[in-house]
Amino acid sequence: MSFYAPDKDAEFINDIFYTQNQAKLGDTGQSMIEYNNDLYAIIAGSRYLVRMNTAGVEKQRYAIPESEGDPRYLAADDGYIYMTQYGGQVTKLDANTLKVVGTFKGGANLEGIAECDGKLYVANSYTKNDAGYQYHTDLFVINAANMQLETTLTVDLNPNQVLEEDGKIFLISWGNYADKGYSAQMIEPQNGNKQTSLGVATNMAVGDDMVYFVNSETDYSNWPETSTNNTFFSYNIKTATVNSSSFLKNAPAELATSSVYMMSVDDEKGDIYIGVTFYSNSNGTMYRFDRNGNFVEKFDCGGQNPKTMVFID
């Protein structure tokens, strides 16, 4: 876990968790959120959820029982943390103690999660069995208070990334890697869960009443050599308009052909961050643009495969 100061009032720290705790974070940082001035991170390979202060000092951790599936993604609201898991489980934890206070069981391998108006929107992505992979079209709507399923929405195949902005849910589905490709949808909870297709995208970020998309098409057929072509576009929530033109200006040329692993938006400044991976060849690179898409800088992100970026005061 790296620390970066956009205002340049502090040095970049490659491994702030080790600096603060004199211990390694563990195997495979999967996802991280900021909530009530604390950081919560899933360390998937080491099978635990950790709570830290915004300086990276560990406060608590919750070890995932061996009988349960791998942890995946997080959402938070009203004093609780919600964690999706493979094997069909959403775990509800007290944000201050990391004590389990409720669970939802259903589905198979659960991925992205977002909270909106007391409901949890959870992607039920796929099942793996002896016959191979079975991809699903389920987006569960769960009552966050009692952790009961309210309804199941039928969405595009293999739903994965789920985000909320301005009372709307945005979803990226991964298809079946054959005749069904990646897709982006908007779901409107206040309009009967109406669904709108927004295009083809592999990743997205939300903020400032905008949704920023990328379709990062990477050819792995000559692995470990890869080739990538990126298409950037955006959706303005206020005007309900898709802009098929790139939201980036004067971007470094290499970004057009680098595999995008994550995007994030500074919720105060509106700056857009795009992280690319070079897999095991080297550390990833982070590209920073202002809210108008003007290129600001790029920097080594401090490790391979940048996955999540959160912003603190």
PLM features: residue spans?
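Predominantly soluble domains enriched in secretory-pathway, periplasmic, or organellar proteins
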Residues: S2-D313
